[in-house]
Each structure stands twice: as C-alpha cells, then as structure tokens.
Amino acid sequence: MAQEQSYPTIWKVSDNLWEIIKTLLEEFDPPASTGRPRHDRRPIFNAIIHRLRTGCQWNQLPKEFGDDSKIHRVFQHWVKLDFFEKIWAALLTECEELEQVQWKWQAADGWLGKARMGGDKIGPNPTDRAKNGTKKSLLTDGVGGPLSIVIAPANVNDHKLLEQTLNSIVVERPRPTSANPQHLCLDKGYDNQMSRQIVKKHRYRDHIRRIGEEKIDEQGQNKHPARRYVVERTLAWLSKCRGLLIRYEKKSENYLAQLQLACALLWYRRLIRAVGSIT
C-alpha cells in the first residue's frame, strides 16, 4: 500500500498560502488610500505563526520579523476583523470544492488546558487541582479536519458546549438527507438526554458510546470501525503548538484567534495533499 506523502511543519507562509491570505486582506483589510504606505504583512503573518509554534512572548519574537509591538498591533486588528476565522473558512471551502471534506461522519470532543495569566473564559480545572484553565470544544470531519471550535471556562461540562460547537461551523454545512445522512460520534461525556436532543435538532444521527461499549458481532469483532478517535488525534496535534498548549492570553478572543489559525493550517496541509504541491 502506498504511504501518504508527509509534509514539513508549516513555520512560514508559502507563496500559495500567501496568495489566499492576500486576497482576503484586499477584501477585509485593504490599505488606506491616504497616508504612508503600509508595511508588508507577510513577515507579520510569519511572526504570528512562529509564536503559535513556539509559544514565545510577543517581545521575544526574533528580530528578523520586525518590531514586536507593531506585530502585536496588527494581530489585535486582525482579531477584531475575525480574520483568522476567515482564513480557516477560505481554506476549508477550497478543500470542499476539491471534495476533500468528509461530512458523512463527524466527531466532537473537549480538551482542557492551563491558563497561566488569568482573564476571561477561565475556570477551575477539575483535572489540575482546580487551577485556572480553559476548555476547547472541537468538531471535526470524518478524518479530523476541524469544522468548528469554541472555548469556555475549564469547569464547563463538554455537553454544555455541544450546541454552540455545532452552531459555529465556519462554512455552511451541507444539508443532510435520508440518502446522505450525517453521523456525529461523541464519547460518554455526552451520554445524556440534552445532548441527544441537540444532536437530533441539528439533523445528525448520534453515535454516543460508553468506553468499551462498541458493538461486536457473533465472532467478537467490532461491527463498525472506530470513528471518534479522529477528533482526539486533532486535539493532540493542536497541543503540539506550544502557543495553544498553555494559554497566556488574558483576552479569550486572542487565544481563540490562534486556535483558528492552527485549524486553518490543518486545512492548508490537506489542500496541498490534494493538489500535490507546496511552494
């Protein structure tokens, strides 16, 4: 069996990706018609990716990226424009046009993380001696591509974020039909009536299993392949970004923007697998 080609970790904006981002900048953040010419935004975007990967403080960014205070100002400006979510949506849309989004099977799960600096949307983490933390709730397609992500205090139960997560898909979700149903896989944290009602309301077929409760046939084999693991795999990949592993941002919207950027980069990797090139 041929192995899937692997691509290096994205540390800077490729030419292809920059063309997509530049088009979005022209639409949502065009330069002013008067005043001094605007500085090149590409090094600034590279700096934001570097910070996402390393988790360094803004004032510790390498000098090659330019003035750190200017980089931070531009980042804050883009956060207010929801620009990182727009990049995510644009890349997901391109993948969908290439039939690279697997809507039939989806999965959702939550992920707890530390929040060192305080701020909004934090709460006592029940798995970390009640220290401050933030919860992320993620929805993925059938192979782990992120479709939506929301954040909340760490002490909010997963199932209480389910409806917000399903409402936050960054592109229009195809309407499920009897011929083309959509399935949603959830773990035991969603094994309650409220979650089942939400799943039904959003026209999914629910697959909520307790640990060790997978269906088996007469020979003791699983009837259906495990599908929930894809969201756990994506959460594990996101935790490799040191800027996401521990939240240092006091403003939740700044932390969410970095999560959105990481999700966008995952779709870009799928896009280059589909077209077979990266520059």
Residue map of PLM features:
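Short alpha-helical elements
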Residues: M1-T279
